[in-house]
Amino acid sequence: IPGGRTKVKNVKTDTEIQQLGSYSVDEYNRLQRTKKTGAGDLKFSQVIAAETQVVAGTKYYLKIEAITKGGKMKVFDAEVVVQSWKHSKKLLGFKPAPVDK
């Protein structure tokens, strides 16, 4: 389906996906520090699920495990767009993932 999302296979061993997850956490931390909100002390653990979507570049939807300052493992949803021809990537969104019941 053009414009639809595609699930990424073998996420835990996909180096590019794991690097995008690490970038997402680092960028979130950097943005939080510039806002001086007191947040932004997450430590990347791993991407546990990912989907891609072709837009003006490739948009990645990542489910990321990160460790909080207090040592708790939490799951976050991140959106990153990569435009390889411009050598650019941008974090579009980063928030706690909804808790599955």
UniProtKB/Swiss-Prot annotation:
Domain of life: Eukaryota
UniProt function note: Strong inhibitor of papain, ficin and cathepsin H, B and L.
Protein name stated in the entry: Cysteine proteinase inhibitor B
Organism of provenance: Helianthus annuus (Common sunflower)
Keywords: Protease inhibitor, Thiol protease inhibitor
Family: Belongs to the cystatin family.
Cleaved signal peptide residues: none
Keyword Calcium part of the UniProt annotation: no
GO molecular function: cysteine-type endopeptidase inhibitor activity
InterPro entries listed in its UniProt record: Cystatin_dom (IPR000010), Cystatin_sf (IPR046350), Prot_inh_cystat_CS (IPR018073)
